[in-house]
UniProtKB/Swiss-Prot annotation:
Active site: 87
HAMAP family named among the record's database cross-references: Thymidine_kinase
UniProt entry keywords in alphabetical sequence: ATP-binding, Cytoplasm, DNA synthesis, Kinase, Nucleotide-binding, Transferase
Superkingdom of the organism of origin: Bacteria
InterPro entries reported for this sequence: P-loop_NTPase, Thymidine_kinase
Gene giving rise to this polypeptide: tdk
Name assigned to this protein: Thymidine kinase
Organism: Cutibacterium acnes (strain DSM 16379 / KPA171202) (Propionibacterium acnes)
Catalytic activity: thymidine + ATP = dTMP + ADP + H(+)
Similarity comment: Belongs to the thymidine kinase family.
Length: 216
C-alpha cells in the first residue's frame, strides 16, 4: 500500500542528501520515480545537497497541479512508482492535498522532505499540512548541533550579524537595502536568547585574563 511520508528536520540535517539517497535506493530496485523541487539552493530545477550532490528535478511553481501532472505523465504511457518532493515546506497547502490524492487514488508512494518551522518558529503552511495528512512523519537520522554543542532544533535568520524575528517567511540571499542574510541552526535556548555562534565567539574574544605586564 502506498504512503505519504514526511521527512523533516532543521537546516543542515541532511534532508536533501536523504532525498537523493532515497531516490537512488528506489531506482536501484527498478522503481521509476519523479523528482520535484522548489526554491532549491542552486536556484534551478534541481535537488542539491550541501555535500555537493545534485540531480535534475521538476520545478514546482505555485500554479502546478501535482496530481494532474502525474496523471498526464501516466496517460502518456509513463510508469511512476514514487515521487521525491524536496523543499516541501514551500509547497502550497492545496499541493500537499494533491500529493495525498496521488497516494490514495493512484497508489504511488510520495516521499516529502522539508523544514518544519521558519526562523520565527512558525510552521510553514506546507509542513503543517503534511503533518496533518502524512502517514508517517520521520526525523532525520543525523541531527545538527548548535554552536554550544546541544542538538539544534531552531532555524535562525541572521541579518547583518544579528538574529531577526520578523520579515517574510521565505528569504533567499540578499533581502534588500544592502543587508546580508544567512541562516544558522540553534538550540531553543540560544534561539530564544538571540545568541548566535558569531556573537558567542565575539564575547569570548573580549574576555581577557587579568595580567599585569609589569610583573616578570
Amino acid at each position: 500500500m502506498a504512503e505519504l511520508v514526511f521527512h523533516t528536520g532543521p537546516m543542515d540535517s541532511g534532508k536533501s542528501t536523504l532525498a537523493l539517497q532515497m531516490d537512488h535506493a528506489q531506482s536501484a530496485h527498478d522503481r521509476q520515480g519523479v523528482r520535484y523541487a522548489m526554491h532549491d539552493r542552486s536556484g534551478g530545477a534541481r535537488i542539491t545537497s550541501r555535500i555537493g550532490l545534485s540531480v535534475e528535478a521538476v520545478e514546482v511553481t505555485d500554479s502546478l497541479d501535482l496530481y494532474q501532472d502525474i496523471v498526464s505523465r501516466l496517460s502518456r504511457g509513463g510508469r511512476i512508482d514514487y515521487l521525491i518532493c524536496d523543499e516541501a515546506q514551500f509547497y502550497r497547502t492545496k499541493q500537499i492535498d494533491q500529493l495525498a490524492r496521488v497516494v490514495d487514488d493512484l497508489d504511488i508512494d510520495v516521499y516529502c522532505f522539508g523544514i518544519l518551522a521558519d526562523f520565527r518558529t512558525e510552521l510553514f503552511p506546507g509542513s503543517k499540512r503534511l503533518v496533518e495528512l502524512a502517514d508517517r512523519v520521520v526525523e532525520p537520522p543525523v541531527s545538527p548541533l548548535c554552536w554550544c554543542g546541544r542538538p539544534a532544533t531552531h532555524n535562525a535568520r541572521i541579518v547583518d550579524g544579528k538574529l531577526v524575528r520578523e520579515g517574510d517567511q521565505v528569504g533567499v540571499g540578499d533581502i534588500g537595502g544592502g543587508s546580508e542574510i544567512h541562516y544558522e541552526v540553534l538550540c531553543r535556548r540560544h534561539h530564544r536568547q538571540g545568541i548566535t555562534g558569531e556573537i558567542s565567539r565575539a564575547t569570548l574574544s573580549e574576555q581577557t585574563l587579568p595580567f599585569d605586564g609589569s610583573r616578570s
